Amino acid sequence: MQTASEEPCATRGNGPIIAAMPLYNEEETVGSVVLQAKRHVDKVLCLDDGSSDASARIARKCGAQVHQHRYNRGYGGALKSIFSIAREQDVEALVILDSDGQHDPDDIPALLAPILDGRADFVIGSRFIDGGGGDAMPSYRKLGVKVISTASNMASNLGIKDTQSGYRAFSRRALKRIRFEQDGMESTLEMLEECASNDLTVHEVPTVVRYDVPKGSRFTAMSHGFTVLSYALVSLSQKKPLLVFGAPGAALLSLGAGIGMRALNSVNQLTDGTVSLDVGPGLTAAWVGMLGISLLFTGVILHAARHTLRRLLMTNFGIE
């Protein structure tokens, strides 16, 4: 379990428990997912994100409450609407799962358990802890998820093993505190940052994800990975500039100094008293050293500016 604070989680109240799923042209699978999910929750909510097929009609016939976007707003945009509806309905807990059949609705009780017994505010169905896994998950995708998770964890300090799992559950407390701006898949990381900032307790439970579904992810692995990794690196650079800029800068400065020393040691004195110096290594040392100094100073300045801004916010507004 990853804990942002030792503050106890909210205990169970009287609100409904809802399973919700973004919906975008999933007419082949949404019906079975809704019917399975209904067995474990009080209500199933589908957010139709501009589908052009019969997804919304099928979801309604299977008993789901359907809300629709007039045009596609992206995964994060769909989640924003789901969160808003859940807050309006004052739900006790909200489970998010995919409508394409990748997530097993029978795992819903396992995701809800840590929330309903007060152990967690936010639960992630993880493929990378004992008992979890991905049915024929490509190795390149595993590597990509682990790289993204590493960058995200360096920024949030939560230690989550599967930051990209879309199978998630939220307590009422989490729904009230989590706010996110991204409309794309980056919202998965933004939520974790919000958990760290708002002292919410995060827990992972094992789940198995299928990859042999009719359509699978709406995003290609490359575009998804690049977009989310870019967000993770930007977030990390904002929160830990000394690590992102200062450490590489110091390394480059040391490398430049080493190249420069080798260049000086290779100076040859000719028989006529003149000195021969290989210009190439000297120029390389200068360029590498200047780049290192620039990165190092950038990291130091951003680090100082971040801490100054935090002090000002704390002093004037009480915001940490």
How would you describe each model-predicted region?
Residues 18-22, 45, 68:
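Short hydrophobic beta-strand elements that form part
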Residues 14-17, 36-45, 54:
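Short loop->beta transition adjacent to catalytic acidic/histidine clusters or analogous donor-positioning motifs
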Residues 1-36:
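N-proximal low-complexity "stem/linker" segments adjacent to membrane-targeting elements
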Residues 1-13, 157, 182-320:
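Hydrophobic helical membrane-anchoring modules
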Residues 65-88, 93, 105-185, 211-228:
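Acceptor/aglycone-binding surface of glycosyltransferases and processive sugar-polymer synthases
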Residues 48-56, 101:
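A conserved acidic beta->alpha catalytic loop
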Residues 28-32, 53-62:
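Acidic helix N-cap motif at the loop->helix transition within catalytic regions
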